[in-house]
Amino acid sequence: MRTTFHQETEEGVYNSQIRGEHFNLHVLGHISPDIDYRIRHSFSKKGFDEKNMFNGTDIMYINWRASEKWSFLFGKYAVLIGGYEYDAAPIDVYYYSKFCNNIYQGFTFGASAAYHFSENQSLVAQICNSPLSMGNPTLYAYNLAWNGQILPWWKTIWSVNMVEDQSRNFINYFSLGNHFEYGDAMLDIDIMNRAGLSQKRFLFSDMTLISKFIWAVGNWNICAKAGYEWNDISNVRDDGSAYDVVIAPGTEYVYAGCGLEWFPFGRDKVRLHAVYYSDSEKHRNNFELGATWRVNIITRR
């Protein structure tokens, strides 16, 4: 669970509030030595939506490890889009990029097959309901993701995606998530290119760039994150509709922030944070103090 005290100005208007932001229940275990399952339900999301019956349940899958090299997953899971901000659990993210904020659903029903080259290298093919679908189960996304490690200090979540929107048009995502570690310092660099199949400027005209830095000092984390997103105003079809329905043509967006995290009882139980961030769209300035805690209710071995 995470709760936060916010002090914020948006377009010059002051707002103060204390709110619960995340309350999740995790259930995980094994049906057999080769089949595991996981459920993560978020009580902080609308639990039932006529367009999305399992809206409150982010994760609900079974995973079959068929062999040392192959595994197969069925159920509801994250749409495999590369990038470390997108991949992080929402409870661990204090402020998001516009892409992550605007995408309709990051978790959908589908199936995937993974080939494990080694413990740190896997290639995953996934077909699932589209993250751009407003509850229409006949819209799909086709995803290929590499979870890898190029060097001992360089890990990756890279993906190529073909995603169908409400108008049944496809957009391509090419996303490179990179995680670097050096001693107690960690750096994430995410690069995403988006383009419609008939878009004139396929590269570098509709993008997201994100950088996050963490320096772990004892039970403390010193953190900073910034992002820059843009979509050229010319990225529209002849009828005026946008190729990208998540980041509108003509968008140029900057956000940045920094903060401290403190883990008083080790790094897996309680986390206290103080974070400031701002953005260029709503001229938001937000300072927050908060606490996150995890409790094991039942553990069986």
Predicted regions and their residues:
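Outer-membrane beta-barrel pore domains
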Residues: 4-14, 32, 49-50, 61, ...
